[in-house]
């Protein structure tokens, strides 16, 4: 069992309010007939959220490339030749201008990513200044800066950060096949520091990295058994980038991705489930099925860190076709 202060993967000990999800139980959900599974997930979604409201987030890379990690999916690793140029941390003014544009286009949350294994104390000083400036615009803020040292999460919280993104990436059993420079437990430990500091958690994973269905179930089990569950769960479809070890990963059938969205919704009923990276390669019909299966958040903007994303006009047209609307204070409903 892996534990971390204030945030842990639960054991089989009954919890007073949250259900324990075994891998076998989640595998059984995956085996549910497709339309029955989507229908069940849609019911759970409607019990907990306004099904027409989609939370819009914009993601910006504020420090690009040169990461020392060896994540097999990531074009920002310094170990791979992917054409991504290393850039230093951007100036506050440039980031604030991008945040203003994001807000004007309807985003309610501004997410900032930095390609570090983990920030140094001097980096935290700069990042906290950025967070304060973005918060002054009236946006929610989210940061993904890697593994945190003691005290850093508290500094981020004090600066006004709302969410910290730290994905589990994949199941514990598959982790070593994808990443060799850190351990699954390292992720759990940083999540513990984030929770202890009082930050909200954004934590999900990537689908399509040659994992088995059982390993997909293992990822969802790891997420659903975090106590408390993440407020936001981004489900990414692998974006294959030439030069990375996973550039030739096997294709994942679209129904398997929709199944994963549905299972995430059923097992984490009160979490926002974000349809995240990989949308550029999805048809409108596939995205519609994901929304039906319980996805209620997207990244909005033409770029996700260093990979593509659907154009904003295209997202607006799709949402209009599906009678969906951006989430606001007025249309937000979330069950307690």
Swiss-Prot record:
Transmembrane segments: none annotated. Pfam families: BATS, Radical_SAM. One of its GO terms (biological process) is biotin biosynthetic process. It catalyses: (4R,5S)-dethiobiotin + (sulfur carrier)-SH + 2 reduced [2Fe-2S]-[ferredoxin] + 2 S-adenosyl-L-methionine = (sulfur carrier)-H + biotin + 2 5'-deoxyadenosine + 2 L-methionine + 2 oxidized [2Fe-2S]-[ferredoxin]. Its cofactor is [4Fe-4S] cluster; [2Fe-2S] cluster. [2Fe-2S] cluster binds at residues 111, 142, 202, 274. It is an enzyme of class 2 (transferase). Binds 1 [4Fe-4S] cluster. The cluster is coordinated with 3 cysteines and an exchangeable S-adenosyl-L-methionine. [4Fe-4S] cluster binds at residues 67, 71, 74. Keywords: 2Fe-2S, 4Fe-4S, Biotin biosynthesis, Iron, Iron-sulfur, Metal-binding, S-adenosyl-L-methionine, Transferase. One of its GO terms (molecular function) is iron ion binding. Coiled coil: none annotated. Residues 52-279 form the Radical SAM core domain. Its EC number is 2.8.1.6. Pathway: Cofactor biosynthesis; biotin biosynthesis; biotin from 7,8-diaminononanoate: step 2/2. SUPFAM superfamilies: Radical SAM enzymes. Homodimer. Catalyzes the conversion of dethiobiotin (DTB) to biotin by the insertion of a sulfur atom into dethiobiotin via a radical-based mechanism. NCBIfam families: bioB. This is Biotin synthase. The lineage of its organism: Bacteria, Pseudomonadati, Pseudomonadota, Gammaproteobacteria, Pasteurellales.
